[in-house]
Amino acid sequence: MKDEIDENNINDRSTIKDGQGKKLHSNTSKAVALLVLLGVCGYLAYSTLITNKKQPVELPKEAIIKQTERFRPAQPKPVLLEPTEKNNLLLPKVELPTPKRNQTNADDSLLEAAQRAPVLAYASPQKSQANAEKNNDTSPNQLERKPDETAQRFNHLLKPTNLEGIHASTLTNRNYIIAMGASIPCILETAISSDQQGFTSCIVSRDILSDNGRVVLLDKGTQIVGEYRSGLKKGQNRLFVLWNRAKTPSGVIITLASPATDALGRSGVDGDVDNHWFERIGSALLVSIVRDATNYARNRLPKDQDKNSSDTISSGPNIANIVVENYANIPPTLTKNQGEMVNVFVARDLDFSSVYKLKVIEDKKQIVNRSISRNFYKNSAVILK
């Protein structure tokens, strides 16, 4: 028993000694690594100190600009003539010739220098001549006088506004003219529907007289043809109609190019307006019903149902939304039945002088007799007082 205990103690001591030896070995390795690191750092510091020493600074060499061509004296300026006196304005101007000195050599050297130059500048000869003439005409005192900005503004304020006058004129012959602004009552011959653009026509319900009320220019029964465009906007309840041409029973035609109005002169034609509420509300109800049906079907399906059936159910609301978008943008429709009354607002003076001619149907004696009795109507028993 004692021998076993002694062997155990000896084994424990040997393990303790082995652990202490390992610790000493690790400490020595750490010390060696630290010394190596310090040596590397010292070497780097020493190398940086050597490189940071002041190096001799080389000054840039000064560029010396030398003259490659000979010096040329400036050409003499042309002598300007002194302004003549007021009494000698009619005398012709005499230009003195300027002396020319070796112009050929100077021109050749300038031409060679211009060809060697990287950039060439050109000047318009006409502008330069005009500027030279202006400079010769103006005196140095005038060049020194520059207008002040305040003076220019004041002069601009003193200028009045140019107003063009408008002259009054008269109509050539009022017996042949239907003046602008007249109203022509007309009965629709065809019905109107704003779903599609198209043409329409109407019949004049009474005789239309001239501007002075003496001559019938458009007989009763005249046919007027016009056109209208499709597509009313939401909230509108009037349709614009443009009357193009009128044709009398005798075959006289004239271009109107005038708009249609109602009895009170309001632009456009009124009528029965259909806003298509049933289609719009029906599409909204369709969407709600389809959504409820798809939700109910989705809840009724088992969780392990096939994917194709779920895709079919989910595509229902998308189709309903597309239908709603198409029906929600339906424009309102205006309809006006045939036989209803409309008016034509004359937008320009209508001249019938090229197709109608007037002639006297009573002699002077008959006219005088009717004027004495104050009966201005032919074959009438009514006496006007």
From Swiss-Prot:
Region feature Disordered, mapped onto this chain: 1-23, 123-145
This protein's UniProt keywords: Cell inner membrane, Cell membrane, Membrane, Transmembrane, Transmembrane helix, Transport, Virulence
Subunit structure: Interacts with virB4, virB8 and virB9.
Membrane topology: Single-pass membrane protein
Family note: Belongs to the TrbI/VirB10 family.
Organism of origin: Bartonella quintana (strain Toulouse) (Rochalimaea quintana)
Domain of life: Bacteria
CDD domains: VirB10
Gene name of the record: virB10
High-level lineage: Bacteria, Pseudomonadati, Pseudomonadota, Alphaproteobacteria, Hyphomicrobiales
UniProt feature, compositional bias: Polar residues: 125-142
Spans traversing the lipid bilayer: 31-51
Chief place of localization: membrane
GO CC annotations on file: plasma membrane
Gene3D superfamilies: Type IV secretion system, VirB10/TraB/TrbI
Its job: Component of the type IV secretion system VirB/VirD4 which could be a major virulence determinant for subversion of human endothelial cell (HEC) function.
Subcellular location: Cell inner membrane
UniProt protein name: Type IV secretion system protein virB10
